[in-house]
Amino acid sequence: MNSNTVSSFQVDCFLWHVRKRFADQELGDAPFLDRLRRDQKSLRGRGSTLGLDIRTATREGKHIVERILEEESDEALKMTIASVPAPRYLAEMTLEEMSRDWLMLIPKQKVTGSLCIRMDQAIMDKDIILKANFSVIFNRLEALILLRAFTDEGAIVGEISPLPSLPGHTEEDVKNAIGVLIGGLEWNNNTVRVSETLQRFTWRSSDENGRSLLPPKQKRKMERTIEPEV
């Protein structure tokens, strides 16, 4: 096993522990708590994959961080912080919408890259909007936290979420996953719209109804992917 993989996991475990202590003092805002909850799932998945105990990894991560801080001067720390662009967190869903459980009468699930797509194929003839919580950097989508499909009545009928055991995804991965979800929902004569905010940081263009305008090549690719699978 790569030593960098192990030490990265150890540091992530300790930093999560620090953030959890911060949240326990009721100091975290909604985006902070949302990331904390999702990072916990990711760490559990990584720990299982690597075969490492999270408590032991947290202690080792503490030693690594302490050693770095002892060697770091205040001036170097200021320069590092100033040189790293800070991502922005955009929330289209409330915590209730993100944490709400939902059921599928005819479930369909597909994994593409490190993203899991789930949808209810029993839904027909509905108007559906896709909303997401995600981070952006340099005015482009950096990381998807969670995307969900809602009917006009507020029911959840689809979802795209990162797999805890496979961290990391690209903007292109998110676009492809959205295309698969849209195609699957439209298969049953549903009308699907993408929220304006999500649209702005992915394709950066839309029609008057907020429908994503996929490039022709990508649209053909999505059609070939969707027809035999959904």
Curated annotation (Swiss-Prot):
Gene Ontology process terms (BP): symbiont-mediated suppression of host cytoplasmic pattern recognition receptor signaling pathway via inhibition of RIG-I activity; symbiont-mediated suppression of host gene expression; symbiont-mediated suppression of host mRNA processing; symbiont-mediated suppression of host PKR/eIFalpha signaling; symbiont-mediated suppression of host type I interferon-mediated signaling pathway
Pfam families: Flu_NS1
Subcellular location per the Swiss-Prot or TrEMBL entry: Host nucleus; Host cytoplasm
Residue ranges, annotated region (RNA-binding and homodimerization): 1-73
Location of region: PABPN1-binding: 223-230
Motif Nuclear localization signal mapped to chain: 34-38
Chain spans, region Disordered: 207-230
Similarity annotation: Belongs to the influenza A viruses NS1 family.
Complex and partners: Homodimer. Interacts with host TRIM25 (via coiled coil); this interaction specifically inhibits TRIM25 multimerization and TRIM25-mediated RIGI CARD ubiquitination. Interacts with human EIF2AK2/PKR, CPSF4, IVNS1ABP and PABPN1.
UniProt free text on domains: The dsRNA-binding region is required for suppression of RNA silencing.
Protein name as catalogued: Non-structural protein 1
Provenance organism: Influenza A virus (strain A/Chicken/Hong Kong/220/1997 H5N1 genotype Gs/Gd)
